[in-house]
Amino acid sequence: MHELSIAHNIVTIASDAAAEAGVDRISAVHLRIGALAGVVADALRFSFAIAAEGTPLAGAELIIEEVPVVVFCPDCNAEVTLTNPRLFRCPRCDRPCGQIVHGRELELVALETP
C-alpha cells in the first residue's frame, strides 16, 4: 500500500509549510490526483488519518479533486478527455492518442487553517 508513504509525504510537506507560516494547526488539505496516478483515494484518506496523528494535521480533512485523463489527438489537433482511460483512443475520431496532457497529477494544492 504505497498510499501510506504518499500520506506521510503529504503530512511532512504540510507540517513544514505550517511551521514556516507559524501555524499551529491545519484543518484541511486539498489535493489534485490524476486518474493515472495509481492512487486509491479511499486508501489515501485512511492512510492520511493515520499519518497525521500527533501532527498539526491531526483531524484534518483530506479533500481530493480527481483529474480525468486528457490527451492530445494529433488527428483532431485538439485536447480531448478520455471516456475510458484504459483505451488511449480519441473519443472524436477513434484514432490512437498517446500524448498525455493531464491525468498523472499528484499535487498538494492548498492548506486550510481553522
Swiss-Prot record:
This is Hydrogenase maturation factor HypA. The gene is hypA. Belongs to the HypA/HybF family. InterPro entries: Hydgase_Ni_incorp_HypA/HybF_CS, HypA/HybF. Keywords: Metal-binding, Nickel, Zinc. PROSITE patterns: HYPA. It comes from the Bacteria. GO terms for molecular function: nickel cation binding; zinc ion binding. Ni(2+) binds at H2. The keyword Zinc applies. The keyword Zinc applies. PANTHER family: HYDROGENASE MATURATION FACTOR HYPA. Zn(2+) binds at C73, C76, C90, C93. Involved in the maturation of [NiFe] hydrogenases. Required for nickel insertion into the metal center of the hydrogenase. One of its GO terms (biological process) is protein modification process. HAMAP family: HypA_HybF.
